[in-house]
């Protein structure tokens, strides 16, 4: 989502933010499921690209975002806030369309993926961006990482709602 340059002293500086958010649907069973996910996300005009991941069992979805005036943020802090809100909106809009879960990740400007093995990727260079206001703060709801780490006990995180004794009794 971001292009960086290096100053003479080696320090990175943000050069350009493109407004793209990457969603991932992982652990698909076969090529039929991959193609199904691609066909579903093609229905939204905000889908810039959708393609099979290098494993052959995932789909990467690129979604366009812009501010309500059509611009993109340029200041680093504004970009971080914008991208976090854009990621959450993308998950909220795309998840109901799919019978498979979107892999939740921390919104990251440096998120990347390997070269695709997809012979027929979906690509729409004229996709319409989702338009959102420039946020001033991070989203209020818990992040995926916070939800996963709420419990102190690893067994309770593996099977929420069950007591540790029940979990161990089932395991042994």
Q: Where are the language model's segments positioned?
A:
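Conserved hydrophobic/aromatic beta-strand scaffold that supports enzyme active sites
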Residues: 20-22, 62, 112-114
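Short Gly/Ser/Thr- and Asp/Glu-enriched loop/turn motifs at secondary-structure junctions
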Residues: 52-59, 107-112
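C-terminal accessory/binding modules appended to enzymatic or scaffolding proteins
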Residues: 150-172
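Signature for HUH/AEP ssDNA processing cores
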Residues: 1-57, 65-84, 145-148, 163-167
């Amino acid at each position: 989502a971001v292009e960086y340059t290096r100053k003479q002293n080696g320090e990175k500086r943000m050069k350009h933010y493109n407004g793209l958010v990457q969603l991932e649907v992982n652990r698909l069973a076969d090529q039929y499921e991959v193609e199904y996910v691609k066909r579903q996300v093609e229905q939204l005009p905000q889908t810039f690209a959708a393609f099979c991941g290098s494993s052959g069992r995932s789909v990467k979805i690129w979604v366009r975002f812009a501010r309500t005036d059509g611009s993109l943020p340029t200041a680093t802090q504004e970009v971080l806030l914008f991208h976090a809100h854009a990621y959450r909106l993308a998950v909220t809009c795309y998840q109901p369309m799919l019978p498979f879960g979107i892999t939740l990740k921390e919104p990251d400007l440096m998120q990347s993926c390997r070269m695709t093995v997809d012979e027929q990727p979906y690509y729409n260079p004229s996709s319409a961006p989702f338009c959102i206001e420039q946020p001033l703060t991070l989203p209020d709801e818990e992040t995926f990482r916070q939800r996963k780490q709420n419990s102190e006990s690893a067994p309770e995180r593996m099977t929420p709602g069950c007591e540790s004794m029940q979990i161990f009794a089932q395991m042994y």
